[in-house]
């Protein structure tokens, strides 16, 4: 029997795998999953933002900064641009203007995107308001697919669907922040401290084969569109895609694998009636939901047939989140998945034979 054990960044252990009998050459094979949640960065926290990036070489990179200020009436007051590289958090003095002294404003900032005239198309829109700015969204390119969230090219679109820029610096992630209820100083000069956060979630897979070989793996059902500033909801017209399988070289199929993926936030209804890890299966996913999941394909020692193990991601940072499968931006998810022969003949609905 095969066992797949999984751990996410949080803190308790759950070794409740149940297995599915499958006739396979020499007898019954059963596959099982164990989920141990571990340490997650909770929503609302903004610590350690510089380590949560695409490439270690560029992990501190913040440049090409656009800062847009909106007044209390929701209309744009000013747009600032700086091409220089800065630390995170970044403190700057904004000359908003003495005519706005005492006014309460909202400040948006987006980094590692475009150049000075990136918002030129928006400048010509008569209803260029704070509401419209909240509709800015990132999209993956049609040619690169969802893997371009972590590499390749992404696109920035306006709420109305205008392509504002192509983001070519894949190793420096799109970083954003938003400051609300900022009061403009009497002289119009207002100091703002911008703490940027990455515009995607990092999912790290640790795959540990025991008495089996891992042939390939991938992350599936990833949103292709994500709001930049309006967090906590999917873009209404969102589509979903799968990262292509990562093929494991034959010499490494029995070794531990560690691989990071970058995805957009993904909000879905909770898993129906889930009380244990094995309930986080396809049969319990609400109709119309598109939760993100990982697929692992392996071959047990002594067999030739391939088996697929699917686990739904998100939540599981504690046992009381067992029904929760949203992928949120301000968390890092790390999963430890142990796949091994077990032999007790019980069944796991997350495992199937590859036909």
Description of each model-found segment:
Residues 1-5:
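Sec-dependent N-terminal signal peptides
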Residues 7-10:
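C-terminal motif of bacterial Sec signal peptides marking the signal peptidase cleavage site
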Residues 12-15:
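Bacterial signal peptide processing site
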Residues 17-19, 30-58:
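Short amphipathic, basic-aromatic surface patches that mediate peripheral association
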Residues 21-27, 278:
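Extracellular distal adhesion/interaction modules in secreted or cell-surface proteins
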Residues 27-35, 203-209:
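A short, amphipathic beta-strand motif
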Residues 50-134, 193-196, 202-331:
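Tryptophan-paired
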Residues 130-197, 206-208, 319-355:
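Extracellular beta-sheet/turn segments enriched in Thr/Pro/Gly and aliphatic residues
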